Amino acid sequence: MTVADPHDAASAAHARPTPAVRVQSVSIRHEGRDTTTPTEVTFDVDPGEVVLLLGPSGCGKSTLALALNGLVPHAVPAELTGTVTVSGMRTAHETVARLSERVAMVFQDPDSQMVTGTLLDEVAFGPENLLLDRAEVLSRAEESLRQVGLWERRGDNPDTLSGGGRQRLAIACALAMKAPVLVLDEPTANLDPAGIDEVYAVLRSLVDGGDHAIVLVEHNLDAAIELVDRVIVLDRTGRLAIQGPTREVLADRVDELMRLGVWLPVALLAALRLRAAGIRLDPLPLTPHELTAALEAQDALPAPAVAGAVDETVATGVARTPPAAEPAVRVTALDLDRGRTRILNGIDVTIDRGSFVAIVGTNGAGKTTLLQAIAGVIRAPAGRIDVLGLDPAKADARTLARTVGFVFQNPEHQFIKSTVAEELAHGPRLQGIPADEVEARVSAMLERFDLQELRDEHPFLLSGGQKRRLSVGTALIDGAPLLALDEPTFGQDRARASELLTLLDGLNAQGTTVLVVTHDLQLVAEHSSHILVLDSGRVAAFGTTASVLASDALDEAGLRRPPLARAFRELERHPSWRSVTRLRDLPSGPTS
């Protein structure tokens, strides 16, 4: 008979570090809501560990993130049951100011945390409030701004930065706090590839030290996958569905994740499609490099469906309407300045009607500015832009709304009403549409975007994904012949993003011209007919999606090919696959 040594148990207890974060049976109910999201969630995060929170849109990921630094329940009206402990401090019993010394936060919307007039002041603001001496404050501010590549712009106003630039600034503010716990909500959503690499390199250096813990809400799994140690998955009700090591969760539980509609690495999605065609990849690859290696190990592969050729069908399989003779958009010698900074420089581009154009470029390249100028959101010099025979610089708001449906990068920038239903109804009412028709359109849009239960909710109280769906609904409801969308899939889970893109594909197939600004180059490869590449405010390339992806234009503009294109471009044994860029070009049924 063997007697357990009590010292062994004590040693095991001492071997495990005290959790940096402990969440125990946490449920959160927002003011005015009947249900809780998240619901009865329990997990720990150890020092030196990176934990990824996954789950469908609206399941409570961002709410849970806000609870980790005490904003829920101290600042956000919500009822929290259970306990959240950070570095030994019960968040319910501490002030947000005190907790900020232990946990730093990067919000889903970086604009919501900007409070000063220069980048240097913004990053110094947090350390100053810790009553640190001036030299330490300035040292932290400089180090953090250099880490995100913004030190040379330290004297600029945050408002002059691009969306991605403001996101990097928010990350610098969090780094300057030197808190042992870092919580990041979609930190790379608006960043170009170089910015993403910089951010994840900084995060890697933090966790390699062993003292920092990171909780990450992120849809770009292709960027995050190599940093993350463990994945926690919430279901649609906000309950904990799965948790475990990264590969164990993503590869071994992939069928459950597919049913939940969460984001997955592109390499894994490709492997699932190939598995359905009888091509066994074991273990399932999670990165482009792993996918390349797995395919190189195959003795033979069937020919890809399209092999990267230019085709005239959208992702839904519907034939595109042939472009009309008259262009949808003509931009001529367009220069635009913001303050003393030139943003657009000599832009000349003509976009055919019925095109689906992705506008891409690094942060600060001028993508959002060009899109806003085309939509008339910002005024360009008269005579420089023609949109379906209309000069946006001269058109009134009602005429513009009939012609161009616009979606802002930040959904909150376009909300002006106090309920979801009223927000949707505003555009049709502005057009003088009869009340019964307005109500019919609103009801249809609420159903289309699964917002029926939220029709009387204030738009600002929606989750990030719900806000995005509402903003897209307001752009679609007037039936404008041209849609201009800035990062339309931001904040959406995979299922919702797929629904939205299928909707845009369908409208495009019927003749609607679609312009999309995005950093998601796999989305570009799958859905766009053309790519417009901007570099430092100039047109670097414009052509069909296949031709631009086959060229060096993206690399030369400081971008990176989509994950699938990167994986297949490196193949040596299967050259017919090197030009594949889209998931739908892969075989998906049994091969003979």
Give the ranges of each region predicted by the language model.
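The feature captures the beta-strand-to-loop junction immediately N-terminal to the Walker
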Residues: 54-56, 360-362
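Helix-to-loop junction immediately C-terminal to a conserved catalytic motif
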Residues: 69, 375
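Conserved ABC transporter NBD signature motif
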Residues: 77-89, 383-390, 400
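Conserved ABC ATPase "signature" region
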Residues: 135-153, 436-454
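Conserved ABC ATPase signature
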Residues: 157-161, 165, 458-462
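ABC ATPase C-loop
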Residues: 174-175, 475-476
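H-loop/switch region of ABC-family ATPase nucleotide-binding domains
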Residues: 218-219, 518-519
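Conserved beta-strand-loop-alpha-helix hinge in the C-terminal portion
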Residues: 238-270, 538-564
